[in-house]
Regions:
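Positively charged n-region of N-terminal signal peptides that target proteins for export
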Residues: 1-4
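Long, compositionally biased stretches
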Residues: 21-96, 102-117
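Hydrophobic helical h-region of N-terminal Sec-dependent signal peptides
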Residues: 6-14
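C-terminal motif of bacterial Sec signal peptides marking the signal peptidase cleavage site
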Residues: 17-19
C-alpha cells in the first residue's frame, strides 16, 4: 500500500511540474512549398490557449532561438522577425514581414520547434 501512495505522489509531482511549465507547443516544419511561407504542424488553437496576439514568445527551432512577438496581419511590423499567425490559412510561420510579402527564416524541415511564452 505504501508503494501505491509513493507512486501516486510521484505521478502527482510529475504532473504538477509539467502543468506549470511555460512550454506551449512542440512541432516541426511540415511544408515549405516556396520561399514565402514555412508552415508549422502546431495547432494555433493550442497556442492561443496560452498566448494571445501581441504576447512576446520565445521560438526555438534547432539552433535558432529568438524572442519575438506573436502577430497577425493587423499588427505585423515591417522588417521585424515575428511569429506570424495567418487567420485565413490558420497557420503559423516564422517570418519577417516586408512590403506585403514574407521573408521566412530558413529552418530545417526536420527541426523541432518549441514555443514558450515569455
Amino acid at each position: 500500500m505504501k508503494r501505491v501512495y509513493t507512486l501516486l505522489l510521484f505521478v502527482a509531482l510529475i504532473f504538477s511540474l509539467t502543468a506549470c511549465s511555460k512550454n506551449l507547443v512542440k512541432g516541426s516544419i511540415v511544408s515549405q512549398s516556396n520561399d514565402t511561407m514555412a508552415q508549422l504542424d502546431i495547432m494555433p488553437q493550442k497556442l492561443f490557449e496560452f498566448a494571445e496576439i501581441g504576447d512576446i514568445v520565445v521560438v526555438i527551432a534547432g539552433d535558432f532561438k529568438e524572442e519575438m512577438p506573436l502577430v497577425d496581419e493587423l499588427i505585423a511590423e515591417e522588417g521585424k522577425l515575428q511569429l506570424f499567425y495567418d487567420s485565413n490559412e490558420h497557420s503559423l510561420s516564422i517570418c519577417s514581414y516586408n512590403q506585403n510579402f514574407f521573408e521566412t527564416y530558413n529552418v530545417s524541415p526536420d527541426a523541432k520547434v518549441e514555443i514558450n511564452k515569455k
